[in-house]
């Protein structure tokens, strides 16, 4: 019996010049997702996906590495300029934006889209250490 040849589908180059970088920086992790203007994901990365564990995930360096990785993957699809939407209170917000610029992407706009409740859910109880 002949062995079936399994071919993996190679990702095709998307040729997208402008995109949107969604940076979510929480107290525990940093995630960078780069999409086209419609919202379809081109590339993404996070501090945890790069192998940072525990409290190292929340550092600015981890956010910088995540942004760099996502930017390089997006630039393979022809991306040149991005608009940044930053969400969350984490330490890696500015570091991620700087890393996008250092990777060679032109940042056109930076917008803070952190959700702020108009007195919605009750916050978690205070930590006693």
UniProtKB/Swiss-Prot annotation:
InterPro entries reported for this sequence = Ribosomal_uS11 (IPR001971), Ribosomal_uS11_bac-type (IPR019981), Ribosomal_uS11_CS (IPR018102), Ribosomal_uS11_sf (IPR036967)
| Organism domain of life | Bacteria
Q: Which N-terminal residues, if any, form the signal peptide?
A: none
- What GO biological process term is on the record, naming one? translation
Q: May I have one GO cellular component term? A: ribonucleoprotein complex
Q: Pfam families, from UniProt?
A: Ribosomal_S11
UniProt KW RNA-binding keyword: yes
Q: Name one GO molecular function term.
A: structural constituent of ribosome
Q: Which UniProt keywords apply?
A: Ribonucleoprotein, Ribosomal protein, RNA-binding, rRNA-binding
In the record, the note on similarity to other proteins reads: Belongs to the universal ribosomal protein uS11 family.
The record's function comment reads: Located on the platform of the 30S subunit, it bridges several disparate RNA helices of the 16S rRNA. Forms part of the Shine-Dalgarno cleft in the 70S ribosome.
The record ties this protein, via NCBIfam families, to: PRK05309.1, uS11_bact
Complexes and interactors: Part of the 30S ribosomal subunit. Interacts with proteins S7 and S18. Binds to IF-3.
The protein's matches in HAMAP family, at most eight in alphabetical order, are given as:
Ribosomal_uS11 (MF_01310)
| UniProt protein name | Small ribosomal subunit protein uS11
Which organism was this protein described from? Desulfitobacterium hafniense (strain Y51)
Question: Source taxonomy lineage?
Answer: Bacteria, Bacillati, Bacillota, Clostridia, Eubacteriales
Q: Please name the gene that encodes this protein.
A: rpsK
